[in-house]
From Swiss-Prot:
Gene that encodes it: rpl2
Protein family membership: Belongs to the universal ribosomal protein uL2 family.
Subunit structure, as described in the record: Part of the 50S ribosomal subunit.
Region (Disordered): 1-21, 224-273
Species, as recorded: Lemna minor
Coiled coil: none
Protein's name according to its UniProt entry: Large ribosomal subunit protein uL2c
Alphabetic keyword roster: Chloroplast, Plastid, Ribonucleoprotein, Ribosomal protein
Molecular function GO terms recorded: rRNA binding; structural constituent of ribosome; transferase activity
PANTHER family: LARGE RIBOSOMAL SUBUNIT PROTEIN UL2M, RIBOSOMAL PROTEIN L2
Amino acid sequence: MAIHLYKTSTPSTRNGAVDRKVKSNPRNNLIYGQHRCGKGRNARGIITAGHRGGGHKRLYRKIDFRRNEKDIYGRIVTIEYDPNRNAYICLIHYGDGEKRYILHPRGAIIGDTIVSGTEVPISMGNALPLTDMPLGTAIHNIEITLGKGGQLARAAGAVAKLIAKEGKSATLRLPSGEVRLISKNCLATVGQVGNVGVNQKSLGRAGSKCWLGKRPVVRGVVMNPVDHPHGGGEGRAPIGRKRPMTPWGYPALGKRSRKKKRYSDRFILRRRK
């Protein structure tokens, strides 16, 4: 991804750094409208996920995470921007006339061919079961449940690694550092998700952040005591607690929040970093 810097004519362009322009011209049969309700509220109207609301209207692109067009070669026709994720998407024209969107693999260009199946080449963008991949393969869009579609390593720049195969399971090292067991029959896509340099982007101004549906973040230490455990005090005061707390009084910043005795604990060999 090429980072573009604007001329320093205004404060927003002086501080902004965006990626190259990738146009979005979605097909009508692969998009549908969605009503973004809630804005971080639950059924009672209470904020459960903060700093959400507003944002530009979006059309959802239907992405083929299952890759169930077996043994039919497809050609990459376009590489498009998707407002619903930080990775780019590719429009694929298959040999039988089917047209679908997939996540853009890093390095894929218009005109490349891809295929899904059991006995397909180990090349970028191809989808096949883990049992048919050699050890050390870089993969993304990984299934957890067979036939449900890819659920792991789908963000921009994400990549997992196949490190072992034993019995009915394969061992993967995920982008978070977690080492996990997954069925060898589950599908995954070879390669890394594109748009690797997305973390180098700088929006440059608060308005660009609002377009993404993200509202301003206020520190708890500048609030009143009624609003946050860190609030109150005369002037600039410390938080007055042994450790940082959430707005609801629970430990924050480093406290493990995963529930104990989950069914999936048996598949996790090493927790994420």
